[in-house]
């Protein structure tokens, strides 16, 4: 086996890359692998991204925010460059964004995002897109920063459902009783995720550890539910505060009595479905750092909220990526 192959994690190389004694079949496999890799990772100049990026006209400096900017030629990759008359710095449309200092074209984000929207683990996404695991982790970190606050403007109305789902802390973080046994039920070892939704949109909020409460529920959803809406819930005591504080009408059901009822007849089916999808999503990232739970919930909200077409979701995120100043260096 080629020593270079055994020492690298490059998804471009095969055991026969660079060998002169390969059989015709081995050489053919290596050729196909290289061709596929090159198709997935075009050079920035060949990707056609310059025309797309140059369609965005900047009106202010990417550094100081001044509006006194002038066009100043093009970068070596064909992207329009600007110069600020106020601070004197030069920049492009991708300066101080998630695409700044990139080595791969923006087009690679399309496949990356489509895979994430399909409930793929980050490891699988890395393999499918033939990227190094470190690249995928770096991009995920950028995406999480980009999506901070993405749920802030969601306002639910009409019929609104609310419920909670739970995930366990990681094995190494499990707290035990003095006798060595784990705490039972909705203990401090369970992370509480609040879910509120109407017919079209949904909000996902990490509420803390253990059982929800009136304060947790109010803090999570008071800014996301229109006053006068109709709340449908499972008689959880913490939900009552939303009814009283926001002037809501309500329907309350005993969830134990709804078990076994067909989904179409279950009045809590809308929120139950989201609970199940969220559990499926989190299971695909089973070893994730629980400190990042709200970041994962922000990503999931993009996955299940409008627009429902995946390509329109990609467009939305790429536009946000060019508009929102988020800068992360690989070694940060």
Language-model-detected regions and their locations in the chain:
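Residue-level recognition of single "structural anchor" positions
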Residues: 1-332
